[in-house]
């Protein structure tokens, strides 16, 4: 239960419980939330004085509701205001200084799925704040458990700019 505040971007208000229905999920939401948390905790100086986190999961098969739930929880865990904007949307909404390629008071977190075959999911994850301020998890893999869910992931390579 709960309400949606009449503001933009919308935020859940007075949420008392989130229910996951059995056998209707492959654990991708929990997996991606853990990826975001690990990326947040990597190179912490990148977001040390920020107010916002924007979560871009548009290149995953997650629903809009799932993406919003992940962003909301991620914002809660990181004590930042959550958004679900892409890089372009952040520019369009005036969050980014387009000329300087800088988000002064936030970081963009993006996960891009590359492949999902034979019980192995591959993806990249990035944390971006500026043209020369970014961290990347490349060629990450997650294997499906016997129950069909993804739980743990391995980082293929780490890069920073």
Protein language model regions, located:
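Short beta-strand edge/turn micro-motifs at domain boundaries
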Residues: 2-5, 137-161
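Flexible low-complexity loop/turn motifs enriched in small/helix-breaking residues
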Residues: 1-134, 158-161
């Amino acid at each position: 239960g709960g309400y949606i505040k009449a503001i933009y971007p919308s935020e859940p208000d007075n949420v008392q419980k989130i229910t996951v229905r059995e056998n209707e999920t492959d654990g991708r939401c929990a997996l991606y939330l853990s990826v975001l948390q690990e990326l947040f905790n990597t190179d912490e100086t990148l977001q040390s004085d920020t107010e916002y986190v924007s979560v871009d999961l548009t290149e995953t098969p997650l629903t809009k509701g799932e993406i919003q739930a992940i962003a909301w929880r991620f914002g809660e865990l990181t004590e930042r205001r959550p958004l679900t904007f892409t890089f372009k949307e952040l520019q369009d909404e005036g969050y980014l200084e387009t000329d300087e390629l800088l988000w002064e008071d936030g970081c963009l977190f993006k996960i891009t799925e590359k492949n999902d075959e034979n019980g192995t999911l591959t993806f990249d994850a990035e944390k971006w704040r500026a043209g020369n301020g970014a961290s990347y998890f490349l060629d990450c893999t997650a294997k499906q458990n016997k129950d069909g869910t993804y739980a743990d992931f391995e980082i293929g390579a780490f890069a920073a700019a």
